[in-house]
A protein has these predicted regions:
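ABC-type nucleotide-binding domain
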Residues: 1-262
Length: 262
């Protein structure tokens, strides 16, 4: 509520009198150009930093009045760059809730669309990851991070660039895992790929530290503002990618046919 925040050493505010609400049980997406303040907003929820002025409230209570440990128990994170420990897959997921059983770990992995990961590992969930063990791709690591967040079962979830570095196949799996994670929870999501926020209950558009507009996807497209321009650019880029892929496939087919004729 009316939050202003300036990073240490910065000459201008990252957030300037920003206000928006995330209703309980809703998914709210933050979008905007690079440097608009999306990740800063997400970082203020768990008090990675504190606002210079204004307030960030969880359940109506200013986060600065909450016990830090209790606050962290209320929030699960899926970061832009997720890290796994040099430990088994099970222990990596179980770090969110150390008393979880193997069955609960498996259920979280299943919900996060990680069945293929478990199946390919030589010792399943007991396979060591990292140095001297198995390695996972960036998209696979993100799915394991989703499993960790699902197992934690916190009422609030913050996803920062959850699909930023995923390939198309992993992005689809991550989206299904996110759907499972979002069930019954309050979600604050930050993403550059606009396709991932279309189904959000509300989209808050940030621009240079200010709230430019907010509403549902269809409402914002119809409004013709910054979000509509971003969506048009996204659709244009997607159409170009499809056309380029089709052209490459056609050229490959032509080359194959000529090779066969020779």
């Amino acid at each position: 509520d009316d939050v202003t925040f300036t990073s240490e050493g910065a000459t201008s505010s990252a957030l300037d009198h920003v206000s928006f609400t995330v209703p309980a049980g809703a998914t709210v997406a933050l979008v905007g150009p690079s440097g608009s303040g999306k990740s800063t907003c997400a970082s203020l929820v768990p008090r990675f930093w504190d606002a210079d002025s204004g307030s960030v409230r969880v359940g109506g209570i200013d986060v600065r009045e909450l016990d830090p440990h209790a606050l962290m128990e209320q929030v699960a994170f899926v970061f832009q760059t997720n890290r796994l420990f040099r430990a088994s897959l099970a222990d990596n997921v179980r770090s969110a809730r150390p008393d979880a059983t193997n069955d609960e770990v498996m259920a979280a992995l299943h919900a996060a669309q990680c069945d293929d990961i478990v199946a390919k590992l030589p010792q399943g969930i007991h396979t060591m990851l990292g140095t001297g063990g198995a390695y996972l791709s960036g998209g696979e690591v993100q799915r394991v991070a989703l499993a960790r967040a699902i197992l934690k079962d916190a009422p609030i979830v913050v996803l920062d660039e959850a699909t930023a570095f995923a390939d198309p196949e992993n992005e689809a799996l991550i989206q299904r895992g996110f759907t499972a994670l979002a069930q019954g929870r309050t979600v604050l999501m930050i993403a550059h790929r606009l396709s991932t926020v279309v189904g959000a209950d509300k989209i808050v558009v940030l621009d240079r530290g200010h709230v430019s507009e907010e509403g549902a996807h269809a409402e914002l497209v119809a409004a013709g503002g910054l979000y509509a321009r971003m969506w048009a650019e996204y659709e244009q880029a997607a159409a170009w990618k499809v056309a380029n892929t089709q052209a490459s496939a056609a050229a490959s087919d032509t080359a194959t046919q000529k090779g066969g004729e020779a």
